[in-house]
């Protein structure tokens, strides 16, 4: 019996796959537990339509990520921060991923989730710093930060 998997089933198939499985296994386990449904012409048509819309959505997300990358990497889009600096040259406060995301939103109107900013530890130095950002699984960008001493 041909079935369309609605969820991943270990050792049998992944979500969206169409496979031939034994009739008893399909009826008594897969279909009963809503892990798969019978592969009728209508169900196959629905699956193909759903896959096309998912591909289109993924392409739109990729295009949006590339557009944001271009915006972030423009030379004039340098994020400015001013912090108090101690005698050792380190800032009293630190620049976190949350602060960077808020700064991008406030200064340039670019909305990025703070979890996409790949900051190993908060920045406590002054000067020009580049921070990597993962916008999409295929698109990475660099945010340029200019951290100044507030006493200057």
Swiss-Prot record:
Molecular function, one GO term: rRNA binding
Single biological process term from Gene Ontology: translation
GO annotation, cellular component aspect: ribonucleoprotein complex; ribosome
Residue pairs linked by disulfide bridges in the UniProt entry: none
Record's keyword terms, sorted: Ribonucleoprotein, Ribosomal protein, RNA-binding, rRNA-binding
Ribonucleoprotein recorded as keyword: yes
Function: Binds to the 23S rRNA.
Family: Belongs to the bacterial ribosomal protein bL9 family.
Name of the featured protein: Large ribosomal subunit protein bL9
Gene source species: Streptococcus thermophilus (strain ATCC BAA-491 / LMD-9)
């Amino acid at each position: 019996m041909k079935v369309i998997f609605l969820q991943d089933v270990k050792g049998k198939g992944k979500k969206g796959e169409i496979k031939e499985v034994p009739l008893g296994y399909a009826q008594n386990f897969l279909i009963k537990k809503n892990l798969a449904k019978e592969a009728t012409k209508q169900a196959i048509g629905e699956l193909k339509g759903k896959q096309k819309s998912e591909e289109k959505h993924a392409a739109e997300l990729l295009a949006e990520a590339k557009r944001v990358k271009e915006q972030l990497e423009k030379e004039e889009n340098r994020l400015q921060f001013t912090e108090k600096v101690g005698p050792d040259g380190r800032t009293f406060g630190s620049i976190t991923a949350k602060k960077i995301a808020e700064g991008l939103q406030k200064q340039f109107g670019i909305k990025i989730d703070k979890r996409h900013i790949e900051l190993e530890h908060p920045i406590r130095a002054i000067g020009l710093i580049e921070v990597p950002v993962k916008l999409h699984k295929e698109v990475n960008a660099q945010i340029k930060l200019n951290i100044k001493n507030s006493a200057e």
